[in-house]
């Protein structure tokens, strides 16, 4: 079945403010992990392998798999998978690096990633410390650096390295599941909001956070056995081709 376009057509506003939304019902997958393995083998996801190991398996990158289950029956409820991301945001201390990702089968930063970077630069211009094609570096305060007498709510809502995620999450997209920023926080990220003792750097190279701005997601409702691809892009033709 071909994808369907949302009722809201793109306007003459800047592309970042009005992406086209497409949806497409797809065959129900009972196992999200197995599906990602299949898409990896089929070359439908970004992948990497260890260059130092000729026998290393190819593994997917720049995608996220989220699962929920009934706490009593353990039955699967919902799967949400980011299959294609427009941008990657990596936080180390007070520095956030935003990168526009290449199309899976294309060359150079994609239009949606560049639009995400433009949105960040417009909203957080005074915090931009470096820029290059397809890449933006921002330096932001941590509330733990400020007055330690601040109440917890004030620290959590103050300007911090979480702000780039907030900016992208507030984009106007005509679909209940988008925009979607998904990823992982390191435990050390707590030091953004609380003054903690210094800990020596170990072998773990996980950043304070690593998040992705979703371009194409799969939403699976396990009780109804329904699955839908949802995508949002300023490049409608490319989105139709990818979906």
Feature map (PLM): residue ranges:
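Signature of the chorismate-utilizing enzyme
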Residues: 1-243
